[in-house]
Amino acid sequence: MQKYALHAYPVMALMVATLTGCAWIPAKPLVQGATTAQPIPGPVPVANGSIFQSAQPINYGYQPLFEDRRPRNIGDTLTIVLQENVSASKSSSANASRDGKTSFGFDTVPRYLQGLFGNSRADMEASGGNSFNGKGGANASNTFSGTLTVTVDQVLANGNLHVVGEKQIAINQGTEFIRFSGVVNPRTISGSNSVPSTQVADARIEYVGNGYLNEAQNMGWLQRFFLNLSPM
């Protein structure tokens, strides 16, 4: 009996691990990869004894007199003003009906069928009907407001800027993560170095958290396992 119990423990542990793996659904983040970028160092100039140098070092602190401070290089920062307000509604209905009726008769019936019909005339009638009613509707709304400063991590060939950023806020025993990525047209950047999120292409906005509050909102692995097996 003791030998059997020793062999049963690994089997039970394997079953628990299998159930856990089947019931756990991994969450795939919308914003993947690094959430920041560092400026690229410029090439080292080669002294050739001439006033004109073909390769000039990149001086990020230098600014021409008539040039604004809009981001244009990798590592520059930009403020995204989150102004997402999306609502959608949909309703549909369908009605269908169909009725049919057919009747016919015989004035004379063959002699060998008179016992079946009981007289010299046979009347037959058939009718049928079908009806269908269906209705459906759905409503959804989403509101997101705030600000987030992101970093330029790629300058596209047409001059657009691909930006990415993350903000972490620790509250009690949980941490809130706000992640953003998208493509910004430099012409839409205001003088305060900000752009609304509604003017960002391919925007990915993610607001998630971890901690015991987030875990309380998730279904347990055993309950999720039986929910997947239930036919209801």
Swiss-Prot record:
A lipid is attached at residue 22 (S-diacylglycerol cysteine). The lineage of its organism: Bacteria, Pseudomonadati, Pseudomonadota, Gammaproteobacteria, Enterobacterales. One of its GO terms (molecular function) is cytoskeletal motor activity. PROSITE patterns: PROKAR_LIPOPROTEIN. GO terms for cellular component: bacterial-type flagellum basal body, distal rod, L ring; cell outer membrane. It comes from the Bacteria. GO terms for biological process: bacterial-type flagellum-dependent cell motility. Belongs to the FlgH family. This is Flagellar L-ring protein. Pfam families: FlgH. InterPro entries: Flag_Lring (IPR000527). A lipid is attached at residue 22 (N-palmitoyl cysteine). Assembles around the rod to form the L-ring and probably protects the motor/basal body from shearing forces during rotation. Its main location: membrane. NCBIfam families: PRK00249.1-1. The basal body constitutes a major portion of the flagellar organelle and consists of four rings (L,P,S, and M) mounted on a central rod. Residues 1-21 form the signal peptide. It is found in: Cell outer membrane; Bacterial flagellum basal body. It comes from Salmonella gallinarum (strain 287/91 / NCTC 13346). The keyword Ribosomal protein does not apply. It is a lipid-anchor. Keywords: Bacterial flagellum, Cell outer membrane, Lipoprotein, Membrane, Palmitate, Signal.
